[in-house]
């Protein structure tokens, strides 16, 4: 879902006027928004944020600037924001767009600017992007490109440095040119992405005149404004933010926002997405582009930053995961009126230095130094899919914004197709996804458990509200719920162990019911608040196969019983990304849940806490991670509210799930380092935990005890194939045992 053309053609552009007003002689690049800047809060917050960003950058001293490579910016003496929201296609926005159209169509007319030279540096990230959970970097490339411009309109780019590193198995491929080089003039009159293989046939919102009636292509309206006053400049810069939407969303069109200079309509920033009809590749989910310009010498709007995001999925399968190619390029080291080679006009539009020179280029930062800054890891704002869908619905109505087919087969994980365990025996299933509109998605999953002879069904509808909040309605029949404190293994690993070794890493409950959930916030560094209510009927699974099918000498342990009945429950959960001392990043989750039996079974309140953090070297060849999981139950001693721990994923080096209780906590610290190559890693870990509050009847029925205090353990092992596969030896330090454990990277458990 991610290959690129090995020999792309260069992008095409059209001339754009550079401002000719006189002012200070220092560059003032405007602060670009992060990759998820399409998340739109209330107007006054957006206005304040834009003004604060402009002021913060203008007040900064010499040195590296966020999202820009610039030198010695001027200082701002003040800035103001005003509420200037207009109506669609009112007289004011039509006049502004006419100026912008004329500015774009004009030729370079400043006789004092004969040429410039600049350096473009950046990264191309290729990573796995699940709907929920951590991203996984597949490949990262770093480029350095000399940018040369000569009046009236000669643009040449030469790639002078290029290097890459593979972090997960992937075949070799080359990127399209607009992943490696700067797209000139904010794209041509026809917007193309990926040399026309991703997006094609889209009229540029600034290249078409403001038309009336049936000939109108886009609608425009002013949604925000900001004034920036620069030291040494008498007149302030007034910028207007214009929202753009297509008149006919079923045609290849763009949608998004433009930031324009009110004086002459010059483009300052452009953030665009596209309609589904714009996408050439049927694997495309969505594509967004951001182009930003900086003000140099108070008069020239020159390229500053470019971000292109291309998200793809398997066309006919909804796997709940996609891949993203994100390009982040920054332009700096400008030399105005520089002496350029006299034969520059005979150069190809894009050229490369020899291979040896590309490899030996002295990059200013390590290959992986920009992961947090560019929004791949850490605390950077991550685009919220709910907010993106909400923005698209507001601009497109009920026309889907995704390029994916509205109906696909749904396979959330490999074990949803086939699995094996001691309760269900052999299970076979398949699901489907239907997206009738941008605001609603329907998913179904059905299968059959052959050991008990029961169908297993699930249906889920989810959608978004006007302000990006999410909702979900779900129902299931004979769903398998686990009594473990945390999942013990990837489902596929559990199926293999049950099939070949007679080891089942589940303690299942047969659950049927309905659930409704509401999610507020979310996306990047903001708090995610989740409200949930449901009604469930719990039943015990009958003991299925007694022995492993491919090892008849090994018997399964018995299924642990719970009280059967119908239970109502409600919960409140808060999840938030967190910054930890020493540069660690991670997240925390707190959940409060109340449960009560509808037929007098009992009830109570449960609280749970989960913290995760990791620390990595710049080269990502050394890593330390820490996790804390805790849970407490207050109420009637229901078996269904006890949890199990011990062995893999909690306290390795002890028998699997030999402890239980209503209160428990587990702490783990693990470290890993490359053994000369990322293909092999040496791993080690320290673990500790305790469990208490075990009800005597539950202890007798389950054959478990509490831990009797803290139980520590250690582990040492080897990670293989970029740490995807892991073999660890573990030893419990208090009446424990030696264990050899096979596992896979937990980031992939939800896919297996």
Predicted regions located by residue number:
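Transmembrane beta-strand segments of Gram-negative outer membrane beta-barrel proteins
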Residues: 114-121, 392-444, 471, 588-596, ...
């Amino acid at each position: 879902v991610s290959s690129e053309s090995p020999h792309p053609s260069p992008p095409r552009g059209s001339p754009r006027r550079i401002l000719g007003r006189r002012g200070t002689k220092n560059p003032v690049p405007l602060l670009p928004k992060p990759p998820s800047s399409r998340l739109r809060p209330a107007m006054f917050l957006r206005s304040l944020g834009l003004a604060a960003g402009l002021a913060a950058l203008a007040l900064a001293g010499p040195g590296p600037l966020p999202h820009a490579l610039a030198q010695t910016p001027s200082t701002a003496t003040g800035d103001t924001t005003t509420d200037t929201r207009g109506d669609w296609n009112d007289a004011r926005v039509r006049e502004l767009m006419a100026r912008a159209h004329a500015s774009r169509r004009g030729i370079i007319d400043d006789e004092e600017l004969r040429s410039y030279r600049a350096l473009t540096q950046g990264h191309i990230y290729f990573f796995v992007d699940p709907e929920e959970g951590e991203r996984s970097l597949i490949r990262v490339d770093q480029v350095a490109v000399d940018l040369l411009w000569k009046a009236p309109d000669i643009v040449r780019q030469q790639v002078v440095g290029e290097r890459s590193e593979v972090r997960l198995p992937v075949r070799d491929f080359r990127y399209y040119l607009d992943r490696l080089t700067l797209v000139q003039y904010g794209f041509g009159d026809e917007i193309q992405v990926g040399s026309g293989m991703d997006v094609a046939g889209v009229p540029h919102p600034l290249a078409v005149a403001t038309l009336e009636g049936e000939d109108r292509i886009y609608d425009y309206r002013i949604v925000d404004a900001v004034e920036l006053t620069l030291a040494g400049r008498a007149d302030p810069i007034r910028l207007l933010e214009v929202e753009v939407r297509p008149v006919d969303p079923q045609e290849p069109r763009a949608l998004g926002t433009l930031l324009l200079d009110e004086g002459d309509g010059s483009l300052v920033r452009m953030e665009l997405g596209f309609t589904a009809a714009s996408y050439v590749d049927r694997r495309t989910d969505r594509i967004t582009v951001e182009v930003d310009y900086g003000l140099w010498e108070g008069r020239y709007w020159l390229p500053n930053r470019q971000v292109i995001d291309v998200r793809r999925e398997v066309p006919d399968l909804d796997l709940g995961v996609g891949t993203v190619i994100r390009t982040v390029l920054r332009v700096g080291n400008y030399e105005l009126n520089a002496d350029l080679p006299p034969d520059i006009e005979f150069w190809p539009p894009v050229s490369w230095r020899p291979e040896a020179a590309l490899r030996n280029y002295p990059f200013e930062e390590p290959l992986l130094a920009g992961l947090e800054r560019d929004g791949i890891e850490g605390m950077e704002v991550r685009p919220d899919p709910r907010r993106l869908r909400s923005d698209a619905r507001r601009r497109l109505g009920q026309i889907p914004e995704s390029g994916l087919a509205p109906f696909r087969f749904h396979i959330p994980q490999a074990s949803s197709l086939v699995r094996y365990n001691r309760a269900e025996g052999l299970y076979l299933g398949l699901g489907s996804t239907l997206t009738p509109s941008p605001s609603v998605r329907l998913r179904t999953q059905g299968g059959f458990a052959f050991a008990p002879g029961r169908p297993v069904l699930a249906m889920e509808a989810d959608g978004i509200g006007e302000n990006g909040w999410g909702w979900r309605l779900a129902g299931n029949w004979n769903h398998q719920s686990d009594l473990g404190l945390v999942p013990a293994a990837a489902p596929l690993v559990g199926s293999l162990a049950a099939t070949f070794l007679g080891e089942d890493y589940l303690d299942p409950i047969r659950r049927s019911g309905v659930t409704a959930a509401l999610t507020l916030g979310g996306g990047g560094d903001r708090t995610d608040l989740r409200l949930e209510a449901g009604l469930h009927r719990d039943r015990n699974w009958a003991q299925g196969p007694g022995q492993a099918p491919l090892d008849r000498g090994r018997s399964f342990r018995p299924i642990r019983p719970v009280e059967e009945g119908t239970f109502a429950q409600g919960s409140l959960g808060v999840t938030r990304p967190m910054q930890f001392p020493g540069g660690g990043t991670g997240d925390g989750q707190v959940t409060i849940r109340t449960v009560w039996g509808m037929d007098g079974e009992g009830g109570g309140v449960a609280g749970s806490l989960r913290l995760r953090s990791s620390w990595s070297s710049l080269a990502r060849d050394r890593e330390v991670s820490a996790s804390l999981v805790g849970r407490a139950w207050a109420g009637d001693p229901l078996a269904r509210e006890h949890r199990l721990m011990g062995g893999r994923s909690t306290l390795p080096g002890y028998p699997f799930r030999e402890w239980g209780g209503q209160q428990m906590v587990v702490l783990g610290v693990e470290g890993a380092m490359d053994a000369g190559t990322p293909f092999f890693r040496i791993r080690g870990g320290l673990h500790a935990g305790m469990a208490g509050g075990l009800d005597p009847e539950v202890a007798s029925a389950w054959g478990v005890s509490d831990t009797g205090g803290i139980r520590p353990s250690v582990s040492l092992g080897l990670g293989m194939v970029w740490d995807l596969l892991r073999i660890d030896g573990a030893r419990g330090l208090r009446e424990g045992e030696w264990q050899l454990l096979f596992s896979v990277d937990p980031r992939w458990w939800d896919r297996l």
